Amino acid sequence: MAYGALTLVWVVLWRFPVLMADDRFFAIASELPRGQQTWAVIEKMFDDCWRLINGRLADGFGTMLFALGNTALRLAMALFYVALSAILWCYLRLSAEALRRPLPRLSLGTGSGAAWICWSLAAIWPFTLIGLSTGVAGESVMLMAAVWNYMFPLALLLFALYPLFRRWAGRPMPWWAELLSVPLVYVSFLMHELVTVAGAVLVAVALLTARSRVWTVPVGLITASAIVGVYVKFTAPGLRARTETYQGIDPVLLTSLRAKAVSAAMALNLWPQRDLKLLLVLALALGLAVHMAWRSGRFSTSRARLLLATLSLMFLSVLAWLVANMHFIREQRRVGTTDLDAINNLLGEAIPVLAAAGGFVVCTLVVVFLLPKGFLSPLTTGTLLAAFLTTGAVAYSSSPHYAWVHRTFYMPGILAVLVVVMICADVLSSAGEATRPETRTTSLLAPVLLVLVGLHSLVVTGTQLAANWAAWRNVEHQVAAVKAGQQDTVTIPITLPCSDVMWYFNGSNLERTAHQWRIYYGLDRDVPVRVRVPETVHSCPIQ
């Protein structure tokens, strides 16, 4: 029943999103109305994405999903989120069992409160992320292209690695189930380069931290599949082509060490700008873990002081990151954001940003490794490492042309919020062993607060999506009137009431936008489609 309710929520939400520019690129690939596709174009899209565009197998699924029809497409978007929440709940239980403090099963009886809170965290994490990350609702969570690029590959990866982690936890699945995961691991590693990085980290964690014998023939095949997947993914021709997109530009301006440092700082500036609350919540979650470990008497006073000092430095590094970011942006605006030569002279401003970000990472890892052994699950630590490594990968491969695009950090953002969820689950399972009632009460504070943040964001996001769809209905009525011969022109609004659930709605080329909508709605070429500021501008009902 719980998953039925969760599915219903996602199905209702996915009735409303209007296609963004990235979505429309795939929707009109076959130049047929309403996202219809030919098999030849689907095959070509897979081939082009792998060889020419970005080296991602995931993007090839865009046209395939549109070919299913609008209803099935939106149902698939909903089910991808439900699937990831379900597999996350399985990992939370598996992680607790590996630490010998299992979470109880979901039930309506007494003693299952902690389990329900953990399940709620796993179910509502996308909305918790929305509450902690500015603009991520429209830029990533409710953007179809982001769902099949990030959510689907991550859900597939976790599903494929589940037999390996069952063996890691000492509860191996049948050998045939482990063998079936071998091709799935390989395919998941080809989907998206950031998923590949995360997958490599998780496989290493499973192999290096297992308490019992883990090496078997199926595990060896899974490991080999992962290694081959990493090699094939990072030698994909499209991945290199993506870094060579900008023709006519001096390569030194993009690939020199100075350029890499400045571009990385530009990209990392997005964290204090857009994800400051997420950084602080991660630090607070670790602070709660330190407090709970100290209350349980599991480390000495000297270690407690060291942890407290490191936590303080962790918060100070976030503040330093924010200050360095403000200075960098001020100088960037002074020299002009489009002048690559001038931007590359901002090395002096970039170094403090990189140092502050690096300080936050180091302090976080020190806190994690100073905690008593077994307090946090190795899976939590591995996910944290994956979040940091994927962030580093995005920063390293960034270019001044798209360093401002927050969506590039969607995967690290997902992993970061999952780390927070896992820390809360570890704390709750640890509190189950505590004898003091106040200890158990303290362990509930952060998880319950995160659930409330998620519920609030769910209400806000749903209301904003519905408001945008209500405004977009006018376009649907215009299309119907044109096809009925009742009017000659279709006017597309240049924006919709609630910008928080929009990203790259029209793009920079309005003529291309009009062309895309003309194809999508199956309008004749001689029908004028204009992208304009609407005559009646509706305000967003909730912010």
Regions found by a protein language model. Give the residues of each.
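Short hydrophobic alpha-helices at membrane interfaces in multi-pass membrane enzymes
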Residues: 166-186, 214-220
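Transmembrane alpha-helical segments
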Residues: 84-95, 153-168, 200-208, 284-290, ...
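Alpha-helical transmembrane segments
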Residues: 1-10, 121-127, 180-182, 220-227, ...
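Intrinsically disordered, polar/acidic, low-complexity terminal segments
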Residues: 2-57, 63, 67-119, 213-220, ...
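Membrane-interface micro-motifs in multi-pass membrane enzymes
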Residues: 114-165, 348-363, 388-423
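Individual alpha-helical transmembrane segments in multi-pass integral membrane proteins
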Residues: 47, 70-87, 126-130, 146-155, ...
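C-terminal structural cap/anchor segments
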Residues: 370-377, 395-464
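Transmembrane catalytic cores of multi-pass membrane glycosyltransferases
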Residues: 11-75, 144, 193-407
